[in-house]
Amino acid sequence: MPMQGAQRRLLGSLNSTPTATPNLGLAANHTGAPCLEVSIPDGLFLSLGLVSLVENVLVVAAIAKNRNLHSPMYCFICCLALSDLLVSGSNMLEMAVILLLEAGALATRASVVQQLQNTIDVLTCSSMLCSLCFLGAIAVDRYVSIFYALRYHSIVTLPRARRAIAAIWVASVLSSTLFIAYCDHAAVLLCLVVFFLAMLVLMAVLYVHMLARACQHAQGITRLHKRQLPAHQGFGLRGAATLTILLGIFFVCWGPFFLHLMLVVLCPQHLTCSCIFKNFKVFLTLIICNTIIDPLIYAFRSQELCRTLKEVLLCSW
């Protein structure tokens, strides 16, 4: 992971030392003040990762199987599932290696563990960046489909979507490699925080604008058919609730992780920040939960994809 809180977990396991970050937990040790630390059992963490892994593999398999789903929109959804798959898979791999090292079942040199740590860090960081990028790409795709409906198929073509997807993957891998190489620099962590905020603002602006357009369309229909106003108000409330849930899940699942990064830059030695740093595994767990929720929001609401998914499951038996 691209921050001090997880960089040395594998090496710490190899040396049989605590895997906490330097300076973490010092507030409680020096002052005796209570410090809230939520413990996530390793079994629960691995179980959530496995659920995410299976769920996203099914999404990728269903989209790959059905040629009717080979449209730009489903390409973005497939890549989101693939990046979420890598997020959960890389975290599960790291946790599994840590447990094997702590149990003494895996014996290796420190240099090999360091190389493995760097590889997992790059994989995790790049998959996280890809996941955020494809969430933004899906929002842009839906925005174009609503506001430029007549020209959508000429604007969002499959070749353009493929080029955008390739650019996202390449940029994510290159940038994550640089982030891991220079993870000790505050500017690197700030860049990640700014990137998250940019994605949050982009999604909020696009989805709010889409909701406003949908409400205007519903209002026009009610005027045309001379229906009562409460029907339109009910539509607006449902749309606002859906938007709140969508953005709320995104913020709750990703926000604490990037808050952690920001606090590493702003107050690495502060006692209160140290208490927050001790819950780093909780923040990773929230991201894993987001990779479980993403298919429910973006993939499984499609009847075509669900039918294909049933076929995939039947063929696998």
Curated annotation (Swiss-Prot):
Belongs to the G-protein coupled receptor 1 family. The lineage of its organism: Eukaryota, Metazoa, Chordata, Craniata, Vertebrata. The keyword Ribonucleoprotein does not apply. Signal peptide: none annotated. It is found in: Cell membrane. InterPro entries: GPCR_Rhodpsn (IPR000276), GPCR_Rhodpsn_7TM (IPR017452), Melcrt_ACTH_rcpt (IPR001671), MSH_rcpt (IPR000761). One of its GO terms (cellular component) is plasma membrane. Residues 64-72, 141-163, 212-240, 301-317 are cytoplasmic. The keyword Glycoprotein applies. It comes from the Eukaryota. It comes from Alouatta sara. PROSITE patterns: G_PROTEIN_RECEP_F1_1, G_PROTEIN_RECEP_F1_2. It is a multi-pass membrane protein. SUPFAM superfamilies: Family A G protein-coupled receptor-like. Interacts with MGRN1, but does not undergo MGRN1-mediated ubiquitination; this interaction competes with GNAS-binding and thus inhibits agonist-induced cAMP production. Interacts with OPN3; the interaction results in a decrease in MC1R-mediated cAMP signaling and ultimately a decrease in melanin production in melanocytes. Residues 1-37, 94-118, 184-191, 267-279 are extracellular. This is Melanocyte-stimulating hormone receptor. GO terms for molecular function: melanocyte-stimulating hormone receptor activity. Keywords: Cell membrane, G-protein coupled receptor, Glycoprotein, Lipoprotein, Membrane, Palmitate, Receptor, Transducer, Transmembrane, Transmembrane helix. One of its GO terms (biological process) is adenylate cyclase-activating G protein-coupled receptor signaling pathway. Receptor for MSH (alpha, beta and gamma) and ACTH. The activity of this receptor is mediated by G proteins which activate adenylate cyclase. Mediates melanogenesis, the production of eumelanin (black/brown) and phaeomelanin (red/yellow), via regulation of cAMP signaling in melanocytes. The chain crosses the membrane at residues 38-63, 73-93, 119-140, 164-183, 192-211, 241-266, 280-300. Glycans are attached at N29. A lipid is attached at C315 (S-palmitoyl cysteine).
